[in-house]
Amino acid sequence: MRKPKKKVCVFCKDKVEYIDFKDTSLLRKYISDRGKIRARRVSGNCSQHQRDVATAVKNSREMALLPYTASAR
């Protein structure tokens, strides 16, 4: 059985120093359709950048730029 290829952290590859909470288009990629923050093994981020993404998403939710949950049906 072959091992799946390991995902490369996008932020490390692009040498991103700071993940801005105001960049909602970037942060929406790391939120599920239910509004949850995607896991590191799903998103492919390294541990440091996953923490930074989580903090940015939480700040963005606090500032009402991103929703806490998915929209009701």
Curated annotation (Swiss-Prot):
One Pfam family per UniProt: Ribosomal_S18
Secretion signal, residue range per the UniProt entry: none
BP term (GO), one: translation
Tree of life domain: Bacteria
UniProt keyword Transmembrane present: no
UniProt keywords, alphabetically: Ribonucleoprotein, Ribosomal protein, RNA-binding, rRNA-binding
InterPro entries assigned to the protein according to its UniProt record, in alphabetical order: Ribosomal_bS18, Ribosomal_bS18_CS, Ribosomal_bS18_sf
One MF term in the entry's GO annotations: small ribosomal subunit rRNA binding
Any one of the GO CC terms: cytosolic small ribosomal subunit
Family annotation (HAMAP family): Ribosomal_bS18
Subunit structure: Part of the 30S ribosomal subunit. Forms a tight heterodimer with protein bS6.
PANTHER family linked to this entry: 30S RIBOSOMAL PROTEIN S18 (PTHR13479), SMALL RIBOSOMAL SUBUNIT PROTEIN BS18A (PTHR13479:SF62)
Family note: Belongs to the bacterial ribosomal protein bS18 family.
Chain's role: Binds as a heterodimer with protein bS6 to the central domain of the 16S rRNA, where it helps stabilize the platform of the 30S subunit.
Name of the molecule in the record: Small ribosomal subunit protein bS18B
Annotated gene: rpsR2
